[in-house]
C-alpha cells in the first residue's frame, strides 16, 4: 500500500488476526483512522499512579468479598452440623467484613457494592 508509512508499526505487529492480539478475544480496543499532522487524540487520559491506587483499593474490596463468601460457607457448614458457637463466630466475621466493604465503598466514589459477589451457592 503506497499510503503505508514505515515510521509507524502496522496492526499486524501487535498480533492482529490472532486470539491474543489486537481485536482478538476479549480485546476492547477500537480502531480510529490516523492522519499525521491532522488527527488529534481526544481520548480521555488517565493518571497512571491514580489508576494503580484505585486498582489496589479495588483488590481490597475483592478480598473482603472473598472473606464474606468464605465465612458464609463456614456458617452454612456450622448450621448443618448444629454447632451454634461456630455459627455465632461466623456471623460476627461476616458482619465485620460486610462493614469493611461498606466503609471502603463509601470512601471511594469509583467503587460500587456488588452484592452478587458476596453470595454463595447453597449446595
Swiss-Prot record:
GO terms for cellular component: virion component. It is found in: Virion. InterPro entries: Phage_A118_VSP1 (IPR009319). The keyword GTP-binding does not apply. The keyword rRNA-binding does not apply. Keywords: Virion. One of its GO terms (molecular function) is structural molecule activity. Belongs to the Lactobacillus delbrueckii bacteriophages ORF1 protein family. This is Structural protein. The lineage of its organism: Viruses.
Amino acid at each position: 500500500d503506497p499510503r503505508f508509512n514505515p515510521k509507524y508499526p502496522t496492526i499486524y505487529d501487535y498480533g492482529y488476526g490472532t486470539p491474543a492480539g489486537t481485536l482478538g478475544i476479549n480485546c476492547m480496543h477500537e480502531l480510529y483512522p490516523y492522519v499525521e499532522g491532522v488527527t488529534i487524540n481526544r481520548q480521555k487520559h488517565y493518571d497512571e499512579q491514580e489508576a494503580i491506587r484505585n486498582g489496589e483499593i479495588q483488590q481490597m474490596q475483592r478480598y473482603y468479598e472473598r472473606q464474606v463468601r468464605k465465612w458464609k460457607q463456614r456458617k452454612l457448614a456450622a448450621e448443618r452440623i448444629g454447632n451454634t458457637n461456630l455459627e455465632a463466630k461466623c456471623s460476627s466475621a461476616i458482619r465485620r467484613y460486610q462493614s469493611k466493604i461498606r466503609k471502603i465503598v463509601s470512601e471511594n466514589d469509583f467503587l460500587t457494592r456488588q452484592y452478587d459477589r458476596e453470595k454463595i451457592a447453597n449446595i
